[in-house]
Regions:
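Pre-P-loop entry segment of helicase/translocase ATPase cores
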Residues: 1-22
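Conserved P-loop
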Residues: 20-88, 157-158
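Residue-level preference for the first positions of well-ordered beta-strands
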Residues: 22-24, 52-54, 97, 115, ...
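Active-site donor-binding loop signature of nucleotide-sugar glycosyltransferases
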Residues: 27, 101, 149, 178-181, ...
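Inter-Walker segment of RecA-like/P-loop motor cores
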Residues: 60-114, 202, 209
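Walker B catalytic acidic pair
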Residues: 119-121
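ASCE P-loop NTPase helicase motor core
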Residues: 123-195
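ATPase catalytic-site recognition across NTP-hydrolyzing enzymes
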Residues: 181-225
Length: 225
């Protein structure tokens, strides 16, 4: 097996290198969440001596569409086998990476895990973490990464705020703009933002948690050319 060269930009590396057990990352579109998740899962699975790892998206199909190809790309030197139908990778140390959907909660039960990535957690039911996934980490004090773009001030926002509480010394919160991805052309992001309302562009590209109040019009929501 050749040495793995983890290729991530500085903002991704800040999350990757964090030694906190639980990490909550609010990131703008095109930040590079999927490549970060893939590298984290590969490394954590290789480091695990007894338990496997999960990647969970809102739906199973989303999990496959988002990460299956990327995982096979970045992990090609350490993958022993790949099962396409179940979206399961077995690595050279016989640890497995499972792609899952939060829309199939029964497939998330009955296992012990060393690591889990919950991608676009804002679009999942909070019970997926609280009642199903959290207990699976208890055996070996497994870790978790919550990552996604905000969707209003829902349970993802609450978790992100709670992760900043100094009394929770095993949690850490992150917030990164799309332009923190140094592989992106910032002019392209600005061009996209120019077609959106201020509030929407803040949420999608600056990863801020916005309150979209129904029935209340705000002048700042409109862009004028």
């Amino acid at each position: 097996m050749s040495d793995l060269k983890v290729t991530l930009h500085d903002a991704q590396m800040e999350i990757f290198r964090s030694e906190k057990r639980f990490k909550v990352a609010s990131c703008g579109r095109r930040f590079g969440k999927s490549y970060l998740a893939a590298w984290v899962l590969i490394i954590k699975a290789l480091q695990s001596t007894s338990k496997d790892v999960f990647y969970i998206a809102p739906t199973f199909q989303q999990a496959k569409d988002i990460l299956w190809g990327i995982l096979k790309e970045v992990g090609q030197d350490v993958i022993k086998s790949a099962h396409e139908n179940t979206a399961t990778l077995t690595l050279v140390n016989d640890r497995k990476i499972y792609l899952k959907g939060s829309d199939r909660p029964d497939t998330l039960r009955g296992v012990g895990l060393s690591y889990v990535v919950l991608d676009e957690y804002a679009s999942m039911k909070p019970e997926v973490w609280e009642m199903i996934i959290r207990p699976t980490l208890a055996d070996v004090k497994g870790e978790a990464l919550f990552i996604g773009t905000p969707n209003g001030k829902n349970h993802f926002y609450k978790l992100w705020v709670d992760a900043q509480d100094e009394s929770r010394d095993d949690w850490e919160a992150f917030q990164f703009n799309s332009t923190d991805n140094t592989f992106l052309d910032p002019l392209e992001i600005e061009a996209a933002k120019s077609t959106m309302s201020t509030q929407a562009s803040r949420q999608e590209f600056e990863a801020t948690f916005e309150s979209f109040s129904g029935g209340v019009f705000k002048e700042e929501w409109v862009k004028y050319s």
